[in-house]
Regions:
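Positively charged, amphipathic and often flexible ligand-engagement surfaces
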Residues: 240-246
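Catalytic alpha-helical scaffold of carbohydrate-active enzymes acting on polysaccharides/glycoconjugates
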Residues: 1-164, 169-240, 256-280, 287-335
């Protein structure tokens, strides 16, 4: 496998989940502004990505593909997760949603999905069908298989083939990777290699780890988290680990914003100079509040990436593009 000509690469993946992704964590009343703002944010993100020629993967919850409540109900798999903690189940939320996107824009997004699919260099991947938690008690591999099959079926209506996966809450479960491969997933976003980012169930997560991750956004605690293409290996699905979560702007932490930006610039420069991969991710709803401040930060990052592209030949690749380039180098049969 010849990796000598590999340039540095910026990979961006976005977890597009709307209310399905936060229903068990944040009361709707407290987060409604973020979720309603998400739709406007996505249009502005697409404009920025077009302006800077940024290739992005949008890992989208399958429920959002349904145009109506009836369509969603008809698309549900028969095997569903029976989480020990019932609060985690998105299925229990369906009874309370509206009939369609116009009535309930927090649970339907067909028009947004079409907007993304029509934009240049944007990949629509999967965030599972139901925002499926792969490390929680009460689910198993057959339930996961049924979930991914349902995601593929509803995406097929849009003529979208799902090839990239992001595990909800980053609950990476390596025992499910063979199922991903069987169902056509060629790449997934794994976690950073530091112990503070190791995949955990909600029950096993600790305040200490959360606190260190917060500090890591501002100070170089876990390092650059960039990596060589060799790390991807040569077996499907490829693990394209995250490097950094782009935390949303916080007025309480505003004084530290220069540190956060410097951290990401330093990562980008290191990746560009050393021909490494840098994988940045966030949720569109993170930008639904303080939208202008968040987009100003992102624009600064993309401006700096443009400098790295001009100076070192750094590329912008979505997960599908990176995995396909790597598959070609490895000589893998991806079918």
């Amino acid at each position: 496998m010849n990796l000598q000509k590999q340039q540095g690469a910026l990979v961006i993946s976005l977890d597009f989940e709307s209310h399905w992704g936060v229903h068990d964590r944040i009361p709707l009343g407290k987060y409604r502004q973020n979720l309603l703002g998400e739709r406007h944010v996505i249009s502005r993100l697409l404009e920025l990505f077009r302006e800077y020629n940024i290739h992005t993967t949008w890992a989208t919850v399958g429920f959002l593909f349904a145009e109506t409540r009836d369509e969603l109900l008809s698309a549900l798999p028969t095997k569903r997760p029976m989480y020990a903690n019932r609060r985690l189940s998105t299925y229990d939320e369906i009874k309370d949603i509206g009939n369609d996107e116009q009535e309930d824009p927090l649970h339907f997004a067909a028009s947004i999905i079409r907007l993304i699919a029509a934009a240049p260099h944007q990949e629509i991947g999967t965030h599972t069908f139901s925002h499926f938690y792969c490390l929680e008690k009460g689910q198993d591999s057959e339930m996961f298989r049924a979930d991914l099959e349902a995601a593929a079926a509803i995406a097929d209506k849009y003529k979208i083939s799902l090839e990239s996966l992001v595990f909800p809450r980053n609950q990476e479960n390596i025992s499910y990777l063979s199922i991903c491969r069987e169902l056509g997933i060629k790449a997934y976003r794994g976690n950073e290699h530091s112990w503070v980012y190791k995949a955990k169930s909600r029950e096993d997560e600790t305040l200490l780890r959360r606190g260190i991750r917060l500090l890591d956004a501002y100070l170089p605690i876990s390092g650059h988290n960039c990596y060589s293409a060799k790390v991807l290996g040569c077996s499907l699905p490829l693990n394209i680990p995250s490097s950094r979560f782009l935390r949303p702007f916080s007025r309480k932490l505003k004084i530290f914003e220069p540190l956060r930006l410097r951290r990401i610039r330093s990562d980008l420069r290191y990746a560009a100079k050393n021909r490494l991969i840098y994988h940045l991710w966030w949720h569109p709803h993170n930008f639904g509040k303080n939208t202008n401040e968040n987009l100003t930060v992102l624009k600064d990052i993309l401006e700096y990436f443009s400098l790295m592209r001009d100076k070192y030949g750094m590329e912008s690749l979505n997960m599908r593009e990176l995995s396909q380039k790597h598959i070609d180098r490895c000589g893998l049969n991806a079918h």
